[in-house]
């Protein structure tokens, strides 16, 4: 329940909320993405036969990777989220005035999460390392491509790997 409740709360947010302040954004990202990283971590550790794991390091890494994935998805889907779904996930960001400085700030935030996650991948059980490492590499490439895409183009197109 401690992981599934926040997950379903975030999914419900998508039904009723179209914009976020910092507090609701943090809650949404935790429930929609960070808890998924924590669920995966539990499965990886359980499968490896470890009864426990280094809580702070692996937990922080799992949460950071989940957050990075979600934020990259938000950046990738700016146009569709705003134009089609009427949503704006990033607090204080108006897609109509989205500029390079805003894009760079958001990309740097994602990069910080990716960097933290990268330092913990090697600590995962061996059978999970490659898959998580590949997923990390995919989202790293996506973040790099978003960084290289001009802000005015990012709000009208979907960056792909």
Regions found by a protein language model. Name each.
Residues 1-69, 75-161:
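Catalytic cores of Mg2+-dependent Asp-rich isoprenoid enzymes
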